[in-house]
């Protein structure tokens, strides 16, 4: 398994936006409103991109080991946003493996001393999507795991700047809203 760590906020936010902007065939999706909610209440600060061969039966344990090795502050962790991309023949993704990974992610803040009440409080949200990318080789899978953390005062001050950067990033994908209908649909004469 190959993996890459990203800590640049703008790069992580672009990766999250790409879940909605790509041409991948969406099999399990989240709403864009969910992404907006994550960004409103938390800040993307860390991401792991893992390229996996589905024939590797230990991939879940390998990802868990990578996550645990990152030394990220668990106490301010809010949520995970996970994008799973498989190739055309990659539908052999095991539900049991996916469940095991999701179970780890949602309980990452649990301790041995947790009571039932504190477990409910320490539960970590994990939103995920699954898409198919035909350009991926058979049996290949990519997991993009993005983490949001509590907003600091500095994060709040920088929010507007990052929002403007994302708006600029999205422009090529969407026509401007101030164009007349004839310019939006030039082939439609009526």
Describe each PLM feature range.
Residues 1-190:
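Tubulin/FtsZ superfamily GTPase core signature
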């Amino acid at each position: 398994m190959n993996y890459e760590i990203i800590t640049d906020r703008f790069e992580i936010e672009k990766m999250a936006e790409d879940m909605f902007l790509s041409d991948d065939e969406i099999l399990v999706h989240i709403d864009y409103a969910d992404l907006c909610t994550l960004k409103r209440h938390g800040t993307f600060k860390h991401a792991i991109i893992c390229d996996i061969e589905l024939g590797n039966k230990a991939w879940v344990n390998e990802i868990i080991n990578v996550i645990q090795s990152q030394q990220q502050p668990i106490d301010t962790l809010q949520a995970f946003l996970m994008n799973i991309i498989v190739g055309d023949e990659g539908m052999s993704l095991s539900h049991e493996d996916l469940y095991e990974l999701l179970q780890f992610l949602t309980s990452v803040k649990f301790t041995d001393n947790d009571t039932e009440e504190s477990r409910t409080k320490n539960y970590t949200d994990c939103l995920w999507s699954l898409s198919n990318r035909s350009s991926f080789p058979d049996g290949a899978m990519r997991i993009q795991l993005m983490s949001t953390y509590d907003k600091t005062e500095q994060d709040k001050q920088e929010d507007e700047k990052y929002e403007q950067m994302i708006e600029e990033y999205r422009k090529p994908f969407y026509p401007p809203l101030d164009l007349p209908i004839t310019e939006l649909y030039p082939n439609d004469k009526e």
